[in-house]
Amino acid sequence: MGHERALARAGLGPVAGCDEAGRGACAGPLVAAAVILDDRRSGRIAGLADSKTLSAAKREALFNVIMDKALAVSWVRVEADECDRLGMQEADISGLRRAVVRLGVEPGYVLSDGFPVDGLTVPDLGMWKGDSVCACVAAASIVAKVARDRIMIAMDAEIPGYDFAVHKGYATALHQRRLKELGPSRQHRMSYANVRRAARLHSS
């Protein structure tokens, strides 16, 4: 939490970290999360790292610890049709901005993974590999990933046949086969070329 502590010492705390999950998927929502940690209140959370480097079981365990110990946590869904309408970059920024606003605690500074979050009323900084070097961004990465995985597992029951619980909406070989067999569902992002190809195949 070196970056967070430095900002707090400069009078810019509390510091929120934000990140998303599902940007590269061709189905399902993008989920954006924001987290404010407070190690003075509840101690440091061991094991925080980029969610992509952790097993599903480890992410779930850390999610529960984050929810218990963080000063504030929020996440929002940006649905597939909104991703199509806005484009992924703007959908990403919009989701992160909403997640920060919904924290319930106004941060003094916001750190994000990769690029800054335009439109905030507080200063912010996009950090290269922020989910690997900032504890609050890593925590947001884990929250976003776990929340989205749970959404995709539930979606698998609501829209059977696509195996959403397995591939989580990403364009794996299995998902591509299901798209070819069934065509797109209402949860697919029509702005993606592989989804449009499947739609054309099933409209001919």
From Swiss-Prot:
As to how many cofactors bind and how, the note says: Manganese or magnesium. Binds 1 divalent metal ion per monomer in the absence of substrate. May bind a second metal ion after substrate binding.
**InterPro entries given for it?**
RNase_HII, RNase_HII/HIII, RNase_HII/HIII_dom, RNaseH-like_sf, RNaseH_sf
Source organism: Cutibacterium acnes (strain DSM 16379 / KPA171202)
The UniProt entry lists the main location of this chain as cytoplasm
Q: Which reaction does it catalyse?
A: Endonucleolytic cleavage to 5'-phosphomonoester
Q: Which domain of life is it from?
A: Bacteria
Keywords tagged on the record: Cytoplasm, Endonuclease, Hydrolase, Manganese, Metal-binding, Nuclease
> What family is reported?
Belongs to the RNase HII family.
Q: Which gene encodes it?
A: rnhB
Tell me which Pfam families the record gives. RNase_HII
Q: Which stretches make up the RNase H type-2 domain?
A: 13-204
- GO molecular-function annotation terms? manganese ion binding; RNA binding; RNA-DNA hybrid ribonuclease activity
Give the protein's recorded name: Ribonuclease HII
